[in-house]
Swiss-Prot record:
Cofactors, names only: heme b; Ca(2+)
Reaction catalysis annotation: 2 a phenolic donor + H2O2 = 2 a phenolic radical donor + 2 H2O
Residues annotated for heme b binding in this entry: H199
CDD domains xrefs: secretory_peroxidase
The keyword NAD belongs to this UniProt entry's keyword annotation: no
Protein name: Peroxidase 23
Signals that turn on the gene: By methyl jasmonate, a plant defense-related signaling molecule.
Cofactor note: Binds 1 heme b (iron(II)-protoporphyrin IX) group per subunit.
Family: Belongs to the peroxidase family. Classical plant (class III) peroxidase subfamily.
Keyword annotations of the record: Calcium, Disulfide bond, Glycoprotein, Heme, Hydrogen peroxide, Iron, Metal-binding, Oxidoreductase, Peroxidase, Pyrrolidone carboxylic acid, Secreted, Signal, Vacuole
Gene Ontology cellular-component terms listed: extracellular region; vacuole
Designated gene of the protein: PER23
Residue list for modification Pyrrolidone carboxylic acid: Q30
Record organism: Arabidopsis thaliana (Mouse-ear cress)
EC number(s) stated in the UniProt entry for this protein: 1.11.1.7
Length: 349
């Protein structure tokens, strides 16, 4: 079964959310949803079919592709710099602490890019492929659809140092989270709370959970905001001095579904990582009313999520003649230098 035939009735009903919010979003004027309408009509089906096929063997890939988009956009904007491998000119962002042995889905993006290049050579940017893949991943997992503004171009460099400092930590306090989001231009409480809802599916490694289970902030005690029953369960899954790479579901109730359960979990002290639970457990925080709203109304959460995703997708995009359209998402295009020999013959090298 292909991408178009896999859409459920509930997902199709969520189309309304995206349509209502497109006009309300402060979309970059140079980005538009119909950017590839004439130049690469099959782009959505190619990306969607790739994800559908991947989900058959890797139910986690949808959440991973959404996270890949987030980690790309927070470092100099949504420019696919995260996809670049090491070169003589720069160090890859994949080696940065928040990404190494954590961010995944690169091979899936490679397959999408290869298929798109066969259909529409040198037309679609890797940055737009990541953006579309994140949107379709949310939709296929039961979340909303929205018209994705397109027309980004790809960076010709990576930003290893910035990736080490710009991305929020799973151990962040609410103040630190707000600073990280504001630093990239996402300065509304709804940006933080709605985008954090991306943790309604997917998994995290035990190494990002265990400090709050056994020695929260150096107290030799667990995080007091943890639900006692949930604490017991997490200690079973992530024993002290155990394997830090073991994976735990962000949402133990509906682990592969994009829904509002994440916020219900926060109300019950069942946020998996510290940077999730602080949205509700920080006294007097302006994020608390939003957690309450999103936990009780799917339409409100989906609407806020779509709006925040469009805002994040519009962070400092490269457009027009900026950057390039990479032929291979892992490397910058080879530079062609035109030379003329003594006989006046022009060639490129």
């Amino acid at each position: 079964m292909g991408f178009s035939s896999s859409l459920s009735c509930s997902a199709m009903g969520a189309l309304i959310v995206g349509c209502l919010l497109l006009q309300a979003s402060n979309s970059n004027a140079q980005l538009r949803p119909d950017f590839y309408f004439r130049t690469c009509p099959p782009i959505f089906n190619i990306i969607g079919d790739t994800i559908v096929n991947e989900l058959r063997t890797d139910p986690r890939i949808a959440a991973s592709l959404l996270r890949l988009h987030f980690h790309d956009c927070f470092v100099r904007g949504c420019d696919a710099s995260i996809l670049l491998d090491n070169s003589t000119s720069f160090r890859t962002e994949k080696d940065a602490a928040p990404n190494k042995n954590s961010v995944r889905g690169f091979d899936v993006i490679d397959r999408m890019k290869a298929a798109i290049e066969r259909a529409c050579p040198r037309t679609v940017s890797c940055a737009d492929i990541i953006t579309i893949a994140s949107q379709i991943s949310v939709l296929l997992s039961g979340g909303p659809w929205w018209p994705v503004p397109l027309g980004r171009r790809d960076s010709v460099e990576a930003f290893f140092a910035l990736a080490n400092t710009a991305l929020p930590s799973p151990f962040s306090t609410l103040t630190q989270l707000k600073t990280a989001f504001a630093d990239v231009g996402l300065n509304r409480p709804s940006d933080l709370v709605a985008l954090s809802g991306g943790h309604t599916f997917g998994k995290a490694q035990c190494q990002f959970v265990t400090p709050r289970l056994y020695n929260f902030n150096g107290t030799n005690r667990p995080d007091p905001s943890l639900n006692p029953t949930y604490l017991v369960e997490l200690r079973r899954l992530c024993p002290q001095n155990g394997n830090g790479t073991v994976l735990v579901n962000f949402d133990s109730v509906t682990p592969t579904t994009f829904d509002r359960q994440y916020y219900t979990n926060l109300l019950n002290g069942k946020g998996l990582i510290q940077s999730d639970q602080v949205l509700f457990s920080t006294p007097g925080a302006d994020t608390i009313p939003l957690v309450n709203q999103y936990s009780s109304n799917t339409f409100v959460f989906f609407g806020a999520f779509v709006d925040a995703m469009i805002r994040m997708g519009n962070l400092k995009p490269l457009t027009g003649t900026q950057g390039e359209i990479r032929q291979n998402c892992r490397v910058v295009n080879p530079r062609i230098r035109v030379v003329e020999n003594d006989d006046g013959v022009v060639s490129s090298i």
